[in-house]
């Protein structure tokens, strides 16, 4: 038993960070060891040494396993059970995106576009320098699993569709360009979020978004009642062309950011904060009453802003058609912020991708991990609320 294994994870982590110069690596190792032991406890229905009639089996020691991460090699002790049935998904799930990141860094080095830092990182991670053939082998294994995810059939309907894009720097033919990463998330009738697609595009054009949505429909996307996105003209046009039956909700967070363009640089008052409050109202009538009061208060001081708001704000109020319990989840694209933060954290290490394929590989690997976590988590929203909401609307219309 190592020095830290007899302690709780929190106590061990504190000791490590205070005394060990390689503290971060040991913190990650300690946490992952705890995960492995907890997985075994769950599989056996009992903790180590616990006597209970619910026990499903017994432990049978450990075997060593090395996990490659960006903080170095982690030596872990994987628990075994007597029947030999226990298995963990920790390594495959964790290393998918790590392998994608390592392969990207290595590819940069082999192509001669990296720095001494990149060479040091890749050699520290894997213990050796990379050849073109070893990178190709890594990429082939990754691409096979990611392709299956990207091309899977969408058998079930998705009531809500959230679309967003972010930009990454990619080197193509010796020129560094910003390329769009298009992302689609759906919410199914079980109330779970699913990442439906992640693709690269040269830019966020109408044709790029149209092709993206057409491919989604070709894989079986159906039943979309509401699409949430920003107001990019090409995206909005593509939604209207490919999914005309769906209502559109303009992300109110993007809307409020856009409002800054219509204000003096130093306005220094609560104008936009008061506008933001109307999105917390119970229903559309309350929101419109607040809007009328807001326009009356600020129209003299900021006529350019209030005129723009009056013309465009209706696009941000579509979510009031939904059950109140769904408002906070569907009035913006904020649900994608955590995924985007994780992508940003990983891609920051690379800065400039050596090609489009390496960028897509890493972002998709991260998307698969997020998708798996979402599918195992509790449902995101209760879709019974929407079912009851629709029934009530039908009764009122009769």
UniProtKB/Swiss-Prot annotation:
One of its GO terms (biological process) is DNA transposition. It comes from Rhizobium meliloti (strain 1021). Pfam families: Transposase_mut (PF00872). This is Transposase for insertion sequence element ISRM5. Coiled coil: none annotated. InterPro entries: Transposase_mutator (IPR001207). Required for the transposition of the insertion element. Keywords: DNA recombination, DNA-binding, Transposable element, Transposition. GO terms for molecular function: DNA binding; transposase activity. PANTHER family: TRANSPOSASE FOR INSERTION SEQUENCE ELEMENT IS1081. Belongs to the transposase mutator family.
């Amino acid at each position: 038993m190592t020095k830290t294994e007899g302690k709780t994870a929190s106590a061990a982590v504190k000791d490590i960070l205070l005394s060990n110069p390689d503290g971060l690596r040991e913190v990650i190792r300690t946490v992952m060891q705890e995960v492995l032991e907890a997985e075994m406890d769950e599989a056996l229905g009992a903790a180590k040494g616990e006597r209970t009639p619910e026990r499903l089996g017994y432990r049978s020691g450990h075997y060593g396993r090395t996990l490659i991460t960006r903080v170095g090699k982690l030596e872990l002790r994987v628990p075994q059970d007597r029947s030999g049935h226990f298995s963990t998904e920790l390594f495959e799930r964790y290393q998918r995106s790590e392998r994608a990141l390592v392969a990207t860094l290595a590819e940069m080095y082999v192509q001669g576009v990296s720095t001494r830092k990149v060479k040091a990182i890749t050699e520290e991670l894997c213990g050796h320098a990379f050849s073109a053939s070893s990178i190709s082998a890594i990429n082939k294994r990754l691409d096979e699993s990611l392709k299956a995810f990207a091309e899977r059939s969408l058998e079930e309907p998705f009531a809500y569709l959230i679309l967003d894009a972010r930009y990454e720097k990619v080197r193509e033919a010796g020129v560094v360009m910003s390329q769009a990463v298009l992302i689609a998330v759906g919410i199914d009738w079980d109330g779970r979020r699913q990442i439906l697609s992640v693709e690269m595009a040269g830019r966020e054009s109408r044709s790029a978004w149209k092709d993206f949505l057409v491919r989604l429909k070709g894989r079986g996307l159906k039943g979309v009642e509401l699409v949430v996105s920003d107001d990019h003209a090409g995206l909005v046009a593509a939604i209207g062309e490919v999914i005309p039956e769906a209502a559109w909700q303009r992300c109110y967070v993007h809307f409020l950011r856009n409002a800054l363009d219509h204000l003096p640089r130093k306005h220094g008052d609560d104008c936009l904060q008061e506008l933001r409050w109307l999105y917390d109202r119970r229903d559309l009538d309350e929101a419109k009453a607040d809007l009328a009061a807001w326009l009356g208060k600020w129209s003299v001081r900021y006529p350019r802003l209030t005129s723009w708001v009056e013309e465009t704000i209706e696009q941000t109020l579509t979510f009031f058609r939904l059950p109140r319990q769904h408002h906070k989840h569907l009035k913006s694209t904020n649900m994608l912020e955590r995924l985007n933060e994780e992508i940003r954290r990983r891609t920051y290490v690379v800065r400039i991708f050596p090609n489009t394929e390496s960028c897509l590989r890493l972002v998709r690997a991260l998307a698969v991990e997020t998708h798996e976590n979402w599918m195992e988590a509790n449902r995101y929203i209760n879709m019974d609320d929407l079912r009851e909401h629709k029934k009530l609307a039908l009764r009122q219309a009769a």
